[in-house]
Amino acid sequence: MITKTHKVDLGLPEKKKKKKVVKEPETRYSVLNNDDYFADVSPLRATSPSKSVAHGQAPEMPLVKKKKKKKKGVSTLCEEHVEPETTLPARRTEKSPSLRKQVFGHLEFLSGEKKNKKSPLAMSHASGVKTSPDPRQGEEETRVGKKLKKHKKEKKGAQDPTAFSVQDPWFCEAREARDVGDTCSVGKKDEEQAALGQKRKRKSPREHNGKVKKKKKIHQEGDALPGHSKPSRSMESSPRKGSKKKPVKVEAPEYIPISDDPKASAKKKMKSKKKVEQPVIEEPALKRKKKKKRKESGVAGDPWKEETDTDLEVVLEKKGNMDEAHIDQVRRKALQEEIDRESGKTEASETRKWTGTQFGQWDTAGFENEDQKLKFLRLMGGFKNLSPSFSRPASTIARPNMALGKKAADSLQQNLQRDYDRAMSWKYSRGAGLGFSTAPNKIFYIDRNASKSVKLED
């Protein structure tokens, strides 16, 4: 059965050899449609001794047979995926000849060890992979031809592992749809291919930059990663639909690491808090401005109210000074009452009632007896009717001058006596500082008219 199918496939490229010579990249697209590609690549997975021992895999050639038996079923699925995948960039379908040489080298090495009969058959499969296109691919070549011209420069700079790794997610989807068991083998294959890519990264660091850029674009399109093994068909188709919209809005949403998400959310929270705090700070400022405006409008509208406010503020600041003007009379009255009590004003008021006359400030003077007071008042002319103090009514009379108390009168009397004694001593001791001594028993009399000076008359 296998040989017959390959004979049919080999008959097609003889008719369409001219198109293959002109456009080599489209022929590489046939690798996706033929399930022989899986047969060619599978020995790579089988060669690793650690994985074959760990997972209990069978020898290499039985795996090739199993995959060939399932060729028809998988090829139909591949043909269904051909039409949607034509829109993707042509670099997705590239496969460099250097990688093919490695695959053929593995096939020859493995076939030489076990069976020499299988080696020409494997080579025929490889030749079929190179030259066997489906009839649909001839139509797709014309569509993809224009895109290939644009992406020629990217194809030249493309690396072998990149093209191989680009195709891996699509193969995962095709085999997952057919059989869940095959997905594990494809995942192992992808890991081995990634290991080969890491080895070639060290050799060519310049080509690594182009690889990183292509990987970013592929992840933007939403293809399934090799680590995810069991998605359904609906889940496979949904990332492709979303991939067309995602690059427009967000450049690389899948590339964001999980560790950076809390930091980014924290930054967003901090920004939102700052935005929330700014209006809170601005509101008191607006209130202050409004208050200032209200005060200015109040000054312009009601100047009298503002003046009263200033008066109240002055009173609060300077209580003593402002109270002095209002409480002056009260203090004077209190002082007058105290002085009157000490000086005996009560007795004077009684005599005043008895006499029926007002003597002004002399009423406040303190006397030992009433007779002494009356005698003093008569000598001062207090009882004369012509006195202006009597004629004036009590309301019109100003504040009476307070008479001295006993203590003040005694101090005043002592001061006057001292001054008198000093003057008399000066009169007696005139010229004493010049060496003359005064006669102790001599008495002098004060007389203005008598003088010892000589008057010269012209």
Swiss-Prot record:
Subcellular location as annotated: Nucleus, Nucleolus
Residues modified to Phosphothreonine: 308, 310
Stretches that traverse the bilayer: none
Residue numbers spanned by region Disordered: 1-21, 46-305, 336-355
Entry-annotated residues carrying Omega-N-methylarginine: 430
Keywords: Isopeptide bond, Methylation, Nucleus, Phosphoprotein, Ubl conjugation
A single cellular component GO annotation: nucleolus
Basic residues: compositionally biased ranges: 64-73, 145-155, 198-218, 265-274
Residue(s) carrying Phosphoserine: 42, 50, 111, 132, 265
Cross-link Glycyl lysine isopeptide (Lys-Gly) (interchain with G-Cter in SUMO1), sequence positions: 249
Tagged with keyword Phosphoprotein: yes
Pfam families: SMAP
The keyword Nucleus appears for this protein: yes
Cross-link Glycyl lysine isopeptide (Lys-Gly) (interchain with G-Cter in SUMO2) mapped to chain: 7, 101, 130, 249, 275, 287, 305, 319, 353, 373, 375, 407, 442
Family annotation (InterPro entries): SMAP_dom (IPR028124)
Region feature (Interaction with ZNF106): 306-458
A GO MF term: RNA binding
Annotated Basic and acidic residues bias: 1-14, 173-192, 336-353
Primary localisation category: nucleus
Domain of life: Eukaryota
PANTHER family hit by this protein: ARGININE_SERINE-RICH COILED-COIL PROTEIN 2 (PTHR22426), LYSINE-RICH NUCLEOLAR PROTEIN 1 (PTHR22426:SF4)
Subunit structure comment from the entry: Interacts with ZNF106.
The protein's name: Lysine-rich nucleolar protein 1
Native source species: Homo sapiens (Human)
